[in-house]
Amino acid sequence: MIQTANDIFVLHTAHTTYAFRKLPTGQLEHLYYGRKIHVCEPLDENAVAPLIEKHTFQPGNSCVYDREHDAYTLEDLCLEMSSYGKGDIREPFVELIYEDGSFSSDFVYESSARFEGREARDAEDALPASYDEKNQVEHLCVTLKDNNSALKLELHYYIYEDCDVITRSAKLINDGENAVQIRRLMSCQVDFPTSDHVFTSFHGAWAREMRRWDVPVAAGKYVNASYTGTSSSRANPFVMLSGRETTEDTGDCYGFNLVYSGNHYEAVEVNSYGKTRFVSGINPQNFCWQLPAGESFEAPEAVMAYSKAGYNGMSQCMHRFVREHIVRGAWKKKVRPVLLNSWEAAYFDINEKKLLQLAKAGKEAGIELFVMDDGWFGHRDNDRSSLGDWKVNTKKLPNGLAGLCKKINDLGMDFGIWVEPEMVNVDSELYQAHPDWAMDIPGKNHSEGRNQRLLDLSRAEVQDYIIGQMSDLFSSANIAYVKWDMNRIVTDYYSKILPPERQGEVAHRYVLGLYRCMKELTERFPEILFEGCAAGGNRFDLGILSYFPQIWASDDTDALCRAEIQTGYSYGYPMSVVSAHVSSCPNHQTLRMTPLETRFQVAAFGICGYECNFCDLKKEDFDAVKAQIALYKEWRKVLQTGSFYRGRNFSDQGSTGSLSGPLTGNIQEWTCVSEDREKAVGFLMQKLVSPNTQFEYYRPNGLNPEARYHFYNRSLKYNVKEFGDLVNTVAPVHIRQDSVAHNLIAKFVKMDGEAEDFCAYGDALMYAGVKLKQAFGGTGYNEQIRHFPDFASRMYFMEQMND
């Protein structure tokens, strides 16, 4: 709901309120953002009096905005947006260079308008944005005018009441006769009157994405930013501001994200008066946009959520928003198939015979979608050639894509492929024909990544080529799934079609070109399931999710690492968009050995697939995989569409307000609850065994406290060899470890795992927790003992009882 009167603006969602007003000077003063509050009627200055700072004199050596209002200095105000040069020395919202070389801009209130629904976004160069299927979202547009020019600045607010989310964007319009340079135009600015916050960002690198870092803010500036040309595994655009005492389930928590896939910038700054400013938007470093007369520039949409129920509460807001108002198309509500990907089974060494053998094994195990990864086109036997040449290698696939696809379909599975459309190898027909299409600087050495260069997607003819090539490819066979990869960061930003003064536009124009390609292809092929990827999570953001309903979270498939990575993503993204695979051991990225069951359980809480050679699995492991897939299919609707909650996790802080580092905790807890709260799946994982600590508990979240649930675990059988020569404590004769006798016993004798099976009310499960059966402690074992070695995990199931 939006209340407006007397130049005061109050925006309400179901549980939050956001308020600002026009100052006597014309600037917009930010009044409040947080827990929902009542505002008196009529809406006037008296109604919001408790929220207004009372300024009667100029503080210290600060500068007054103008002599007529000498009590107002912009340096010490909470503002809705800030420009450069009029006394506010904090992070600006907008920064411009005028024709005369000056920097000072002076945006003041001109008008406002309210609308129902969202405007259509059909332009080819339009940025992606949130949407509402019922088109009932409320929209506020506030227009500011620049006292120094004929520029207008539109601030847009969209209210998603059901999600407790407000989105924001900005549009700069040049109604004058002279061009202006945009050095920065942020998407979001929120000023807080205090500085008692913790700033949380998610950092990492290839194969170790989304490591959570908490920094208590004090005087100064804290920046989370990407410089890679993508939203980046180094610094995801999702960030949080929370109270010093906030936990997973209690306390104030603000979440911020950006619907953008390029270089981004989030900054928290505390000024000398103890006020905190947050800004987010396109990274201003090396950004400079020439805005001619009569044109406009739009900033990406920013997403804001607040909850008084801690990190989990805020996450629920973000999860609902992404599921309902970002992800779209045919796959928005569809259950996703269980896939088998060929990459870690064969890498580049693929051929039709090998792929069909793998597919047949997959079909027997219950796989629904077979994906042929890299290596099928050109003369692509390694990563040094053929990107850009999307022609089938008929030596590897003599019957072409259509022939292989038909054989996969005849087995009863769908067929998918891997592509990397944005890239080109120097060793390719495309590069030889169009070297000018590659993004590099003429006459200067180019810094390559993974032996490849980027195509200049700021050029329309390059976009047309990609759209045409991919359209031909996707039409050539019954392709049901496409993995769209991007395996390097951007270097040497340069477009050969832009003049020198416009090279600061290249990074953003690249992203706009990418969006055009994705928009065209997803509209032409609406039934294809597209999965985004960028060397794992190097482009995991709301911009990509506006076109592709899921993203490969990380190239690291190690279960321990993935548990932390997926936990990191869960703060801002629902698990229904996180692609996760079960791989072989030793793991190909870490060489770590983890139990097959743990690998499955971690992957099951995302969009579950497999990435290992089923043909090489021992019968025992193959049978286990078959059982895993059957179980996942039974529960995947809950796992893919349910509400996800975190409990204890590997990144738990040692003390409140400390810097959160990687893997400091020992237990990971997750719960996923169906929308009707009738079913739930729990997960408990241990990093390392600690001796003589046999007792553990599991505490679910999100259940109906008044309902009675049947609680039980996934009970397993264990190979006797996991106990080593402890077998001699029960064997009538001595058995040498790994001997023929030991192996023979292991073939026929399995150790029963513990069973948890009882009924309890939801409140008892959530508030008291479940005290689990005793773990093995070195003094004996029976079917009531929990076998819980290093990296072990358990799945728990909760089903509401109707009697």
Model-derived segments and spans:
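Polysaccharide-binding surfaces and accessory modules of carbohydrate-active proteins
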Residues: 7-14, 18, 28-269, 285, ...
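Conserved, mostly hydrophobic/aromatic
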Residues: 15, 170, 294, 340, ...
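Short Pro-Gly-centered flexible turn/kink motifs
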Residues: 95-96, 102-109, 289-308, 791-799
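Extended acidic/polar, glycine-enriched regions
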Residues: 171, 177-180, 260, 265, ...
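Carbohydrate-binding surface patches
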Residues: 238-239, 248, 656-705
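Aromatic-lined carbohydrate-binding/catalytic grooves of carbohydrate-active enzymes
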Residues: 331-468, 481
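Glycan-recognition surfaces
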Residues: 425-464, 508-616
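C-terminal beta-sandwich/jelly-roll accessory domains of carbohydrate-active enzymes
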Residues: 688-803
